[in-house]
Amino acid sequence: DCAEEILRKAGSLQDQLKNYQTMVLYLCSHLCEVPEVLKEEKWIPLFVKDTGGAYLRVSAESHITRLNMPQEGNQKWGASRVHKSRVNSLPQMLQEAWYALWAGFSYSGSEKVGEIQFYLCKNMNEEFSLKSVAEKYHFSEPYFCTLFKKGTGMSVIHFVQHVRVHYGTYLIRNSEKKLKKSRKREDLRITAI
């Protein structure tokens, strides 16, 4: 499993990560080149295949500058939110980057708005109201909506719809791939009979 391999590789870097304060996990859906980063940063490949990869970007500083990764055709990038350099953050970072990759969005630079984006992604199949999410984060509904729109450039409802549509598309594409593989295996089995 790719996720297990990524986490295993990252776990082996625990001593090396002690020299860095912050990190972001990037996933790409294609064979990708490592972009240039600032001298106080490092780009660590965790998993690299023809069909994609996972990279950990770490910084000795308390912040990491945002990289605008190209999103062209089937060549997509997903990045987690910025985390403090702790290996135990990696499972959540992997989940965050996966949502960003397949739902086609970037997390807000605002820590609180990014946290809300992740919450909405994790709970995309649930029914919830703006009021209930606002209350969960101790905001009034109007303030919550304003804060979210300012942090993401879209309304909460638009963001949830965007995530659900892209996730649905991902599920359909994966189902089609599995069906094609299954048909090929069945055709081979029938031919063998």
Per-region residue spans from a language model:
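Short coil turns linking two alpha-helices in DNA-binding domains
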Residues: 140-141, 189-190
